[in-house]
Every structure is written in C-alpha cells, then in structure tokens.
Amino acid sequence: VVEVLHENTFTETKNISDAFNKMLGRMKVLDDSREEFVSNVSHELKTPLASMKVLADSLVTQDQVPIELYQEFMGDIAKEIDRENDIINDLLTLVKMDKTAQNLNISQVNVNDLLELILKRLRPIAEKKQIEIILESFRPVTAEIDEVKMTLAISNLVENAIKYNHDEGWVHVSLNADHKYFYVKVSDSGIGIPKEDQDHIFERFYRVDKSHSREIGGTGLGLAITRNAVIMHRGSIKVYSEPEEGTTFTVRIPLIYVST
C-alpha cells in the first residue's frame, strides 16, 4: 500500500512539474513575442523620424537652398509624416482588435454591396498604375459579419494586390458561397511571394521584400490586421503565390456567426 501511495504521489508530482514547466514555457514564448513586437514597433516608428531629421538637417545647414530642392525635400518629409501616421493608425487598429476580440458588431450584411463599395474606393488608386480591377459575383450573398472589420480585411488584400502589382496589371476579386460559407478571392498579376516567405506574411511587421518596402509603402501590419479580422469571424485565410506570377488570397467566412 505504501509503495502504491508513493508511486501515485511521485506520478502526481511529476504531472504537476510537467504542467508547471509547460506553463513557464508558454509564458517565455509570450514574453519573447512581446519583446520582439515592442522592438519592431520602436524600429518602425524611429525610421520615418530619422529620415525626416536627415532631410530637415540638410535644409537647415545649406544657405540659399534652391526652391526646387526645398520643394523636393518638403515633399519627402510630408511622405515620411504620412508613413508615420499610417504605422500609428495600423498599430491602434491591432490593439483595438486585440481588446475587442469578443465584441464584434454582428449584423446582416449584403456582401456583394460591401465588395462594390470597397472597389469603388480603391479604383482611383489602381488607375494611377493603370491596373484593371474586376469584380465577379457568382451569387447574391448575405452574411452575419462585422461590416467595419470585414471591410478592413478585404480592403487590405485589395490594396496589397494593387501596391505589389505591375503597371497595367490586373486585380480580380470574386465572391461565391455554399450553404455554410462565403468565399472571397483576391488575385493579382503582381510580383508574387516566394515560398519561404509565405508562412510568415501574416506576422506583424513582416515584409517579403525589405529592400523595396519603403518605396512601395505599407507598414507590414496590413495582413496581420486582415488575419485577425478573419479569425474573429471564425473564418480562414489561405495564400497561393509564385514569384512574378501573381498571388491569390482566399478568405472563407461562415454565413452565420456563432459566438463561443
């Protein structure tokens, strides 16, 4: 009896020890993730400020700056201010989503109309690069979604499809549904995503082409925001891409929202 009790006590102690070690491991992962995020935020916020300082210092130290150079530098400073503002806005969006993960504003939404409005807003941006945007709706779709968050998710995908595309390219958006889900596909004729990067593109601040990220624009937060919004709807998002052959994102969302 004593041996059995001793064995049971040993087993229970080992189980408690294993559970405690697992908990410590999870806490370390969370802590490391938090430290990395803070480090990334600091770096991203400092970069536009550093650029603005260099430009401003150049203007201050020169006598009789030519008006053309002055205008060019001020234009560059304005772009860096816009970039800083975009980063802050995207960070606030992510923080807000983390805090309100359980507070979706669910309503019956006509998804066809939603996509029409998104593309109407983004067409002028596409026209600057002579990119054609095509919408193909296979059927009328009404779903229980948070209209604001879903608009944000789809808008980010279409904006990326325009941003990382070639001039005179195309963006194709399609909507379909079955008895349980609706599906939005966003395809483009753009630069594509290398296979080794595809597992990381939804991470915060991850950029596929870091050498061109500043000239193309973007904060590295758009796809993280999209993924958050999709997951909050109990949905899924997948990517298929080949370098220089374009990219397709497929979003699947339940027609009826089920809270847990």
Task: Describe these PLM feature segments.
Residues 188:
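Acidic ATP/Mg2+-coordinating residue in the GHKL
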Residues 1-38, 53-65, 74-75, 82, ...:
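Membrane-proximal HAMP signal-relay module
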